[in-house]
UniProtKB/Swiss-Prot annotation:
Localization per record: Cell membrane
Protein source organism: Rhizobium leguminosarum bv. trifolii
Taxonomic lineage of the native organism: Bacteria, Pseudomonadati, Pseudomonadota, Alphaproteobacteria, Hyphomicrobiales
Topology in the lipid bilayer: Multi-pass membrane protein
Keyword list, A-Z: Cell membrane, Membrane, Transmembrane, Transmembrane helix
Keyword Repressor: no
Name of this chain's protein: Trifolitoxin-processing protein TfxD
Highest taxon listed in the record's lineage: Bacteria
Keyword Aminoacyl-tRNA synthetase: no
Cystine bridges: none
Spans traversing the lipid bilayer: 24-44, 48-68, 79-99, 114-134, 153-173, 176-196, 230-250, 255-275, 295-315, 322-342, 372-392
């Protein structure tokens, strides 16, 4: 692989990582908001809240994969039709959540939960348009446009949410559902309008184009399987980490002080992994050369180690001894950090395939096994079992994804 191509690969990866880090600004705001929801007695059922957040992430991953596989084929109408249909399916899930909430909740929690679901219904359609526009700019190499738009919208989202929740909290009044969603929709519509204003003419939709989109019966698309695989594993990961969080809070309060800050670190390190993995997927689809797998593993592992050392240093400054925990959880935490990122990187190989490779099957096996061990950890009260349950899924995927791919598939493009 030439120095120019290698430099281009890493430059692209860091640009995608930069966008991922900016997208985490709302995630941090969401975490604070969820904390303050409990503090100010806003009674939205936590399982519904987490489900909707997870569905939004899965939906955006589906949209991105569909666009990556098809925009360069010029299938504009088919891509947008697929996004609209996926958004309609999201509405179907929201209706199911409303039905479950009506059947299982009572009083204020039921009213506020249903209101939250109903007011979230427009989000998939606007987010789908934004994903389409962002992928158009990505395909044209104009990543700086997306980075600029997302930076502004993330700050709007975080600022407005924290402003409303903070004012409510300090005034001693209860938050409203509308105040929580104002930041979300302001950020979404900011993106939608910003993209619409600068979107290239050939990628815009006239009235006739929209008629064509809604009249399509059979879509000429590739990559549906890859999009569904990416969405499926997102839901598995988020669901599993939510379960781990509940188990830690209920059964292992002694490590909660380390666990929850640790996942802020995981998000920061995963940004680079997402950038590397996406660059791999793009270059396999195009196709163009990229570094060999062992080089990517070395780059990400070194980065993870440096981030972890900073985390340990901050723990030390706070007068807490992470190494005093059972089974030296610091070592297992580092293993999780590296493996979680590596499986994001190697996932890029499978998502370049139209059917997503064997990602769905491997993910189901990994998190089923992790779930069994997590249940044992909760029953036995074993911190060691909890740590193993947490590490097992990413470790299994980081090893098994390259193992099940043929050598030809993994080394198809790099120069020999």
């Amino acid at each position: 692989m030439s120095d120019e191509n290698q430099h281009g690969f890493y430059r692209t990866s860091f640009e995608y990582a930069s966008i991922s880090w900016r997208r985490m600004i709302p995630n941090v705001a969401d975490t604070i908001v969820v904390t303050l929801i409990g503090a100010t007695a806003l009674q939205v059922a936590s399982n519904v809240l987490i489900t909707i957040l997870t569905l939004n992430i899965a939906f955006l991953n589906f949209c991105s994969l569909i666009c990556m596989h098809n925009l360069k084929r010029g299938a504009k109408a088919d891509v947008f039709a697929a996004i609209v249909r996926a958004a309609c399916m999201m509405i179907g899930v929201y209706l199911a959540l409303i039905a479950v909430s009506v059947a299982t909740l009572e009083g204020a929690p039921r009213t506020q939960t249903i209101a939250f679901i109903a007011l979230s219904a427009l989000r998939p359609f606007v987010a789908g348009w934004n994903a389409y526009c962002a992928e158009v700019f990505f395909a044209q190499g104009k990543r700086q446009i997306v980075r600029s738009v997302i930076t502004r919208s993330s700050l709007i989202y975080a600022g407005v949410n924290l402003l409303f929740v903070g004012l409510s909290h300090f005034a001693g009044t209860q938050n409203s559902i509308i105040s929580l969603l104002i930041g979300v929709y302001l950020a979404l519509f900011h993106n939608a309008l910003a993209y619409a204003r600068i979107l290239p003419t050939e990628w815009r939709f006239s009235r006739q184009d929209l008629k064509d989109v809604f009249s399509l019966r059979k879509l000429d698309l590739v990559g549906i399987g890859a999009g569904l695989s990416a969405s499926f594993i997102n839901m598995l990961e988020m669901g599993f980490l939510a379960l781990v969080g509940w188990v830690v809070a209920a059964k292992f309060p002694q490590i909660a002080v380390f666990y929850f800050p640790f996942f802020t670190l995981v998000e920061l390190t995963s940004g680079l992994a997402i950038g590397l993995g996406r660059s791999v997927t793009e270059r396999l689809i195009t196709p163009r050369p990229f570094p060999r797998l062992h080089v990517l593993i070395a780059v990400y592992s070194t980065y993870s180690l440096l981030c972890f050392l900073i985390y340990v240093g901050l723990i030390g400054v706070s007068n807490r001894d992470i190494f005093a925990l059972p089974l030296s959880l610091a070592g297992l935490a580092l293993l999780f950090l590296i493996c979680d990122g590596l499986q994001l990187v190697v996932r890029g190989y499978t998502l370049a395939k139209a059917d997503g490779g064997k990602l769905t099957h491997l993910s189901a096996i990994a998190y089923l096994a992790s779930g069994v061990i997590l249940a044992l950890a909760a029953v036995l009260g074993s911190v060691q079992a909890l740590a193993i349950a947490l590490v097992l899924g990413p470790l299994f995927l980081a090893i098994s994804i390259p193992a099940v791919q043929s050598r030809t598939a993994l080394n198809a493009l790099p120069n020999r």
